[in-house]
Curated annotation (Swiss-Prot):
Belongs to the FMP46 family. This is Putative redox protein fmp46, mitochondrial. It comes from the Eukaryota. Residues 1-17 form a transit peptide. InterPro entries: Fmp46, Thioredoxin-like_sf. It comes from Schizosaccharomyces pombe (strain 972 / ATCC 24843) (Fission yeast). The gene is fmp46.
Length: 121
């Protein structure tokens, strides 16, 4: 509205601050401020806490039922992932990048193998 653009919010769930993943995403965020490329306009929110149950439910829905083990260790389905997570939230696999606006989830296995983070955005 009124010519204003809102930035997408990306949340990086990580165990500690200042990881390589966070540094790379920050570089892309800064680069995005200097370009007209709307794909690079985002706000990075870094969370060292595990996601809420509601957040995890959204993430699992976006990643798909067959890939729930990418977010929760040992999970065989969305329901199983939620149950395991309720009993032990440390089963959540980090780092994990979530683009809430686009419904994209990049689990740890993808983040740790990615050299070009712009492909995740």
């Amino acid at each position: 509205m009124f010519g204003l653009t809102t930035k997408r919010i990306l949340t990086l769930f990580t165990k500690k601050r200042q990881t390589l993943v966070e540094q790379k995403l920050t570089e892309y965020m800064i680069a995005g401020e200097k370009t007209d490329n709307q794909m690079l306009h985002f706000k990075l929110q870094v969370e060292t806490a595990t996601p809420t149950l509601d957040q995890l439910n959204i993430m699992l829905s976006n990643i798909g039922k067959d890939k729930s083990d990418l977010l929760v260790a040992g999970a065989t389905s969305i329901e199983d992932a939620l149950t395991k997570y309720q009993h032990d939230n440390q089963l959540f696999r980090r780092p994990c990048l979530v683009d809430w606006d686009k419904g994209k989830v990049s689990p740890y296995s993808i983040l740790l193998q990615t050299r070009d983070f712009s492909k995740l955005l």
